[in-house]
UniProtKB/Swiss-Prot annotation:
Cofactor field: Mg(2+)
The protein, known as: Phosphoglucosamine mutase
CDD domains linked: GlmM
This protein's GO CC annotations: cytosol
Residues that span the membrane, as ranges: none
Cross-referenced InterPro entries: A-D-PHexomutase_a/b/a-I (IPR005844), A-D-PHexomutase_a/b/a-I/II/III (IPR016055), A-D-PHexomutase_a/b/a-II (IPR005845), A-D-PHexomutase_a/b/a-III (IPR005846), A-D-PHexomutase_C (IPR005843), A-D-PHexomutase_C_sf (IPR036900), A-D-PHexomutase_CS (IPR016066), Alpha-D-phosphohexomutase_SF (IPR005841)
Post-translational modification: Activated by phosphorylation.
């Protein structure tokens, strides 16, 4: 059985993600982090899911049983856990969250002492320890070697100060009316506080978590309520976060959702203009629209692409010395302020952009026009490796001759292949997509 997926360990709470699994996983992680331990302390945060109590208790039991002292900070955004792990000099950080998933799912993700998510190799080490009864049994402590646990309630202030420092000191939000949707999630206290302290007239939606309403018809995946409220209240802009606040969706004053690639492009150009973009390079994923590349090329910024997943974006940023990157889905990483996607930082930077440019949010969004894209999910019987599909290379080259960008990839969880075509001629795109569906239906349903 494989534990780790693309973003830590995730599954249905009480089914796959049981208290027993969480306890043993915490023990395995404790054994792994023991090798380079400096403070014998691990930070644990969570979002607002009901199952968080069960999983947190199990993790605390697992960590203390192998001798670690634990600091529990309660509901806080994922980027807050990353920041506080380093700021409080902990050996590691653990976030209990399933991000944008429904309340009945939950997850566990790990951060090293510097606040970076573990890479695949490090996760594989923890998984190896998890499945070794010998290592787990030998790691158990007794008597005074057993660790302690302490709930820490005053860390929210540290994170708020840190986030406010990402906003230009010469500016204020006094002239902005902002609507915020916290998805009944981890940012329900932090986000409104930050915007109010910076002077914005702040209206807050979905900030009454009850354990099961996280992401429920609200937040980054359901921004329509936010859009309606922005229009009704004649606000300047709306910001929607997901359950753990590492993702952002922006709504303009007309209630229109701003495309994720437009957000990346505008923020990158703002950093460049401010003299804060490192190496004139940003990182995006293979899903990002080519219009992003073309817009940024005009102002001397290169776009380097990587696989889907904010973890891969950050790895590539570190590799090429960039301090900015993100995904079309709303994960935006400001490397100078955060070690992971941070929706609140991104919202503040967009607000600063509006103020500095003296433009409405809708005017900013019109600076980039994404090329038409068609995405279809095709049900298939088998997932033959793409490089083994006869005739695929030739088929792709024929499509690309017409100026169309192609991306074909399998779903990680279902028997689906995702077909993405992008180009300037929508009629031609539809024709080529029909051809692509026919090609893959024959190739993968034999």
């Amino acid at each position: 059985m494989k534990l780790f997926g693309t973003d830590g360990v995730r599954g249905k709470a009480g089914n796959f993600l049981t208290a027993e699994l969480a306890l043993r996983l915490a023990m395995a992680a404790g054994v792994y982090f023991r090798k380079n331990s400096l403070t014998n302390m691990i930070l644990v945060g969570k979002d607002t899911r009901r199952s968080g109590y069960m999983i947190e208790t199990a993790i605390v039991a697992g960590l203390t049983s192998v001798g670690f002292n634990v600091r529990q900070i309660g509901p806080m955004p994922t980027p807050a856990v990353a920041f506080l792990t380093e700021d409080m000099r902990c050996d590691a950080g653990i976030m209990i969250s399933a991000s944008h998933n429904p309340y009945y799912d939950n997850g566990i993700k790990f951060f090293d002492r510097t606040g970076f998510k573990l890479d695949e190799k490090e996760e594989a080490e923890i998984e190896k320890i998890y499945f070794s009864d010998k290592i787990i049994n030998e790691a158990r402590k007794q008597m005074m070697e057993i660790g302690t646990a302490k709930r820490v309630d005053d860390v929210i202030g540290r994170y708020i100060v840190h986030i406010k420092n990402s906003f230009p000191r010469s500016e204020t939000l006094h002239n902005l009316r902002v609507v915020i949707d916290t998805a009944n999630g981890a940012s329900y206290k932090v986000a409104p506080t930050i915007f109010k302290e910076l002077g914005a007239e702040t209206i807050v939606l979905a900030n009454e978590p009850n354990g099961k309403n996280i992401n429920e018809n609200c937040g980054a995946l359901f921004p329509q309520n936010l859009a309606n409220e922005v229009r009704r209240l004649r606000a300047d802009v709306g910001f929607a976060f997901d359950g753990d606040a590492d993702r952002l969706v922006v709504v303009d004053e007309n209630g229109e959702i701003i495309h994720g690639d437009i957000l990346l492009g505008i923020l990158a150009s703002y950093l460049k203009e401010s003299g804060e973009l490192a190496n004139d390079k940003i990182v995006a994923t293979v899903m990002s629209n080519k219009a992003l590349d073309d817009f940024l090329a005009k102002i001397g910024i290169s776009v380097i692409r990587t696989n889907v997943g904010d973890k891969f974006v950050l790895e590539k940023m570190r590799e090429i010395g960039s301090n900015f990157g993100g995904e079309q889905s709303g994960h935006v990483i400001f490397g100078s302020f955060a070690k992971t996607g941070d929706g609140i930082v991104s919202a503040l930077q967009f607000s600063a952009c509006m103020i500095k440019m003296h433009k409405k949010s809708s005017e900013i969004s019109k600076m980039i026009k994404p090329y038409p894209q068609i995405l279809r999910n095709l049900k298939i019987k088998n997932k033959k490796p793409l490089d083994k599909i006869k005739g695929l290379d030739e088929f792709e080259k024929n499509i690309q001759k017409d100026g169309i960008r192609t991306l074909f990839r399998y779903s990680g969880t279902e028997n689906l292949i995702r077909l993405l075509l992008e180009g300037k001629n929508e009629k031609l795109l539809n024709k080529k997509m029909d051809e692509a569906e026919e090609f893959f239906s024959k190739a993968l349903n034999d």
